[in-house]
Amino acid sequence: MSTGVLQFVKGIDFSGNDFSGDRFPHDVEQMTQMTWLKLNDSKLEQVPDELSRCANLEHLQMAHNQLISVHGELSDLPRLRSVIVRDNNLKTAGIPTDIFRMKDLTIIDLSRNQLREVPTNLEYAKGSIVLNLSYNNIETIPNSVCANLIDLLFLDLSNNKLDMLPPQIRRLSMLQSLKLSNNPLNHFQLKQLPSMTSLSVLHMSNTNRTLDNIPPTLDDMHNLRDVDFSENNLPIVPEALFKLRNLRKLNLSGNKIEKLNMTEGEWENLETLNMSHNQLTVLPDCVVKLTRLTKLYAANNQLTFEGIPSGIGKLIQLTVLHLSYNKLELVPEGISRCVKLQKLKLDHNRLITLPEGIHLLPDLKVLDLHENENLVMPPKPNDARKKLAFYNIDFSLEHQRKIAGQMTSPSSSISSVHSGGARQDALARRKEFIRRRKQQADQQSADKVIQGMSKIAGVGAALTEKQQEEEERQLEAKSAVNWKKNIEKNRRHIDYSDIFDEDVGSDEGMWVWEIENFYPSIMDEAFHGQFYDADAYLVLKTTREASGQLRHAIFYWLGEHASLDKGMCSAVHAVGLRNHLNATCRTQREEMNDETEEFLTLFGEEIVYIEGGRTISGFYTTEKPAHLTRLYRAGVNGTAVEMEPVPLSVESLDPRFCFLLDAGETIWIWSGYKSRITVSNKARLFAERLNKRDRKGKSEIETCRQARCPPEFWQALTGNPDKPQGAIVEHVPEGFVAERKKLYKVNIGMGFLELPQVELPKGIAKQDMLGSKGVFVLDSNSDIFLWIGKKANRLLKMAGQKLVVELHQMIDRPDYAQVYRETEGEESMMFRSKFAGWDEIVPVDYTRTSDSVQRVPDLKVIVKKDNMMRADLAALFLERQPSMSYEESEELMEDCNYDLELMESFVLEGKKFVKLPQKEFGIFYTMDCYVFLCRYAVMPEEDEEGEDEHDEDDKPEMDFKCVVYFWQGRDASNMGWLNFTFQLQPNFEEIFKDKLEVVRMYQQQENHKFLSHFKRKFLIKRGRRGLTKNLGGKWPELFQMRANGSSVCNRTIQVDCQANQLCSAFCHMLRIPFKEIEEDGHRGVVYVWMGKDSDPREHEFARQVASDLVVRDDDNDFRIVEVQEGEENEEFWKVLGGKKKYETDSSFVKHTRLFRCTNEKGYFAISEKTVDFCQDDLDDDDIMILDNGDAVFLWIGARSSDIEAKLSYQAAQVYHASMRMKANEKPRKFMLAVRGRESCRFRKCFHAWSKMKEPMG
């Protein structure tokens, strides 16, 4: 149904819609008064026929479409002023020739098409002021075009195949902009340019310009403001350019200029200078005189530190500075004085450091420094350091060192930057001066305000006192008057003749009125005494006294369920009736079921109550519309949740997505089995906000997975509780993108309406695009919203309501598309979700302690005391745990074995523990569990005072204790521990009673006392003991012997039999069984490979381990061969798969450190693992920081939280910065280690690295 508003539409922007095929709205032909129309990016294949009926159309845009021809319809538009059809598929034959004869045609844009020649009859468009033929394949320009179009102001012929221009171009004396870039123009000498005295823009990039074909008379063109001679291989800057006084923008990039020979006083008005991709080594000093310069591009040159003027800080208007791809090692200090600098690019240089003031630039948004390998950033000052606070934790290096008890020395760079007192810089002093001046000014103004208010208050108090005295005198002078006389005196003379008849109350009788639509309505006497409980009534009883005077009694009766307006109007009209009758009686209120005796006697004490109401209310009654169940497909775009409406059917479901089913009382979140859990969680949060804002918390939110959907879900979706028979299949196309949103603004004028679009950068709408005085329409194709501002006038609101109805009907939409009305301040959640960042969630600081939340008296004290969350990073600043010397290790081993009396070994076979043969003592398997029973002597306590009183025969007896060590291999299951606790441990407890201690240990996490009992002969093999003994030993095996921090921790562990597992810092054993027994009876060989950097004192133990443990009990006929690194034979490398690159740098052994970052204590804390760490110390619940001396790695566990990851990243940066400050430490790189894909630089720090264990669940 048409609203009749289309005939008043003056212009509309349909850009971004899909008008392919026959989808163009036919209602456009009703817009007979339309003067402008935009159809950009609308997938048009031909000019719509409806345009031929828009005879008043003046401006038409059809850019970015698929037009092949514009014949027919354009010729029917006699008033056409501008034709913009760029970026189509037009050819010369597809352009009608008669449109150029239109007298009013002024703008012609045919760029980015397939034109090979200038359209026919173009020379007849004599009124044209804009002609754009760029990005075509035009080879020549007819002479007649330049001869006739003498009124042109803008001419763009760039990106064609022009070799020359007609000489008649000199007739374009009014031309202001000429763009000829990317044309050969071999035969165009620019001799005609001086005749174009109005020319202000000249673009001739990549047009084969040389010093010969640039005329010196170019300096006569005083109006030139924008010149582009880039990509022309010019050796120097043309001399004529230096004389252009009004030049604002100059582009000379892509040439071969080696020197910029400018002098002082030239280019004083220049704002943009582009000298990129040249061969400059120096920027002239007079560049700093260009005080209006805002953008300077000098990338891809040969600039050094000496080539940048030291006074560059004088360019106070500079906002963009590009110095990428040069040879800069330093940059002048003056750059930090360019206070308006917003973008600074210094990438791909040789920078060592930057000026300290770089952190003080207030407007700097982009600082590109990548590909500067040796760059060391200066420390941040105090003001900038505050921005390092993350989750209320200050991660600045100085603050963390201070907490750790290591204050920076006065000579350090940090101390010099943050020192106060006399060493404050000029900026800090200026800030302090401004603060004092402002405080002083505020104090003076405050004193003046207080004085003025005091005077006003004094005068006011005096006046008030006089008025009170005057009123008291008047009251004393007044005599007591009757209240009836007061009523008569103050009675308002209001005419009630239109409400009450003249004969009302003129004689004895009773009148009853019912309140209907704010006014009393007289009732017939037959209905007297019948009252509806939802109505209100007015009753008048008039009697004649003996004196002949009339006496009136006025009542107003209120039903129990009467509406507010009826009760109010009955009271008001009762007073009006009394004034109408000039009565002196009171109006008496009567309520249902509480009537007075006087009122009941009027009806013979018989009153009938009737349920309901007989009259209508004067108020508008609102009827809540029935809820429309809708289905939305949820998607995540960054942090925003996008809800795309889909048809309400099972066929809309897709197992890869999450869906929100809004059924009114219940909101369902349905998740497909292939959907992402993050999308489901965000959809749930969206439903929570939808319920809170739109439903006031009255809806229930339910979630269900595809595999288990309750009948209630299917009932809400299909109307049937049974699960549909058909399968839910993937049907949404890959890479599906929802249709672009369009935001219209409704404009109204004298007799016309306009509907332009608001430009959405990158298709993103923001809340600040809406204005309180305006009316906007948001069109997302499947939904259309009308938003009305609070201050919008009534006519604009009405126009918006009618236009949104027409817009909904005109454009082809799905059947489930709906129109919604939104009011400013009361927007629905679905409307808000269409705008980026529109979320009114109350910000909550979850890092605040409960005490600080409960305390409210002094907010400043709370903020000052609790603004920093507790964090413990002290471990990062401690020195690395020193390695134990060989002598100390020997002494520790001796002490640990001193009290050992007995050691029995057991191994789990099947479900029982059996005694381990003595020849296998010290050999472990990764899939087995072992039990060691150790008996220790306990020395008796000596009596210090009564030592001499004991006789020699009375020596105290030696006591003992038993420690049971349970050792579990890395690949063993927990069943071994369960068997031990239920079988063997009870027997030990029964025997040893309270003298028993059980210690459970895991592979490579043994304590020193346990390791000391094996005296460095500790071998760990892969696999299971029984299986390996029977079937193993027939293939080569490689073992690595390694001691971390102490020789007590010496372990020999089997690794992959590959050459890249070798390391020059350790000894290795390579066991090679022969296929056939040699003549000398040897069945194999064991190579003991000595790394060049290995400890010579460990070589003897390597030989013992090889002969006692690596050689099997039945392989005594294996010969042992000692090999020094670099002296290997061919057999050695052949068994290892050929000679390959292995780790030869042993320095990492002295630097390896492993830190654990966790929140398990209730706050963020970092602790350091012992030097003897292993792969299983990498906890999937936490974040780890590993330092190998060359790089600092951040390793993220599979189950760690996002907060832990963010805090650990900041802490790792603090550690990285602290190591850089140490004089004896070499610089380290900051790298990320991805779990399961760790690099060899990371893995080499762990003894016998193997496959990562997958976390449970």
From Swiss-Prot:
<feature type="repeat" description="LRR 14">
    <location>
        <begin position="316"/>
        <end position="338"/>
    </location>
</feature>
<dbReference type="Pfam" id="PF12799">
    <property type="entry name" value="LRR_4"/>
</dbReference>
<dbReference type="InterPro" id="IPR025875">
    <property type="entry name" value="Leu-rich_rpt_4"/>
</dbReference>
<dbReference type="GO" id="GO:0005737">
    <property type="term" value="C:cytoplasm"/>
</dbReference>
<feature type="repeat" description="LRR 5">
    <location>
        <begin position="103"/>
        <end position="126"/>
    </location>
</feature>
<dbReference type="Pfam" id="PF13855">
    <property type="entry name" value="LRR_8"/>
</dbReference>
<dbReference type="GO" id="GO:0051016">
    <property type="term" value="P:barbed-end actin filament capping"/>
</dbReference>
<dbReference type="GO" id="GO:0005634">
    <property type="term" value="C:nucleus"/>
</dbReference>
<feature type="repeat" description="LRR 12">
    <location>
        <begin position="268"/>
        <end position="290"/>
    </location>
</feature>
<dbReference type="GO" id="GO:0005546">
    <property type="term" value="F:phosphatidylinositol-4,5-bisphosphate binding"/>
</dbReference>
<feature type="repeat" description="Gelsolin-like 3">
    <location>
        <begin position="759"/>
        <end position="832"/>
    </location>
</feature>
<feature type="repeat" description="Gelsolin-like 1">
    <location>
        <begin position="523"/>
        <end position="600"/>
    </location>
</feature>
<dbReference type="GO" id="GO:0015629">
    <property type="term" value="C:actin cytoskeleton"/>
</dbReference>
<dbReference type="GO" id="GO:0008154">
    <property type="term" value="P:actin polymerization or depolymerization"/>
</dbReference>
<dbReference type="InterPro" id="IPR032675">
    <property type="entry name" value="LRR_dom_sf"/>
</dbReference>
<feature type="repeat" description="LRR 11">
    <location>
        <begin position="246"/>
        <end position="267"/>
    </location>
</feature>
<dbReference type="GO" id="GO:0051015">
    <property type="term" value="F:actin filament binding"/>
</dbReference>
<dbReference type="InterPro" id="IPR007123">
    <property type="entry name" value="Gelsolin-like_dom"/>
</dbReference>
<comment type="similarity">
    <text>Belongs to the villin/gelsolin family.</text>
</comment>
<feature type="repeat" description="LRR 16">
    <location>
        <begin position="363"/>
        <end position="384"/>
    </location>
</feature>
<dbReference type="InterPro" id="IPR001611">
    <property type="entry name" value="Leu-rich_rpt"/>
</dbReference>
<feature type="repeat" description="LRR 10">
    <location>
        <begin position="222"/>
        <end position="244"/>
    </location>
</feature>
<dbReference type="InterPro" id="IPR007122">
    <property type="entry name" value="Villin/Gelsolin"/>
</dbReference>
<feature type="repeat" description="LRR 15">
    <location>
        <begin position="339"/>
        <end position="361"/>
    </location>
</feature>
<dbReference type="InterPro" id="IPR003591">
    <property type="entry name" value="Leu-rich_rpt_typical-subtyp"/>
</dbReference>
<keyword id="KW-0433">Leucine-rich repeat</keyword>
<dbReference type="GO" id="GO:0051014">
    <property type="term" value="P:actin filament severing"/>
</dbReference>
<keyword id="KW-0677">Repeat</keyword>
<feature type="repeat" description="LRR 8">
    <location>
        <begin position="174"/>
        <end position="195"/>
    </location>
</feature>
<feature type="repeat" description="LRR 7">
    <location>
        <begin position="149"/>
        <end position="172"/>
    </location>
</feature>
<feature type="repeat" description="Gelsolin-like 4">
    <location>
        <begin position="1168"/>
        <end position="1243"/>
    </location>
</feature>
<feature type="repeat" description="Gelsolin-like 2">
    <location>
        <begin position="640"/>
        <end position="714"/>
    </location>
</feature>
<keyword id="KW-0217">Developmental protein</keyword>
<protein>
    <recommendedName>
        <fullName>Protein flightless-1 homolog</fullName>
    </recommendedName>
</protein>
<feature type="repeat" description="LRR 2">
    <location>
        <begin position="32"/>
        <end position="54"/>
    </location>
</feature>
<feature type="repeat" description="LRR 3">
    <location>
        <begin position="56"/>
        <end position="77"/>
    </location>
</feature>
<feature type="repeat" description="LRR 1">
    <location>
        <begin position="6"/>
        <end position="31"/>
    </location>
</feature>
<feature type="repeat" description="LRR 6">
    <location>
        <begin position="128"/>
        <end position="148"/>
    </location>
</feature>
<dbReference type="GO" id="GO:0030239">
    <property type="term" value="P:myofibril assembly"/>
</dbReference>
<comment type="function">
    <text>May play a key role in embryonic cellularization by interacting with both the cytoskeleton and other cellular components.</text>
</comment>
<dbReference type="InterPro" id="IPR029006">
    <property type="entry name" value="ADF-H/Gelsolin-like_dom_sf"/>
</dbReference>
<feature type="repeat" description="LRR 9">
    <location>
        <begin position="197"/>
        <end position="221"/>
    </location>
</feature>
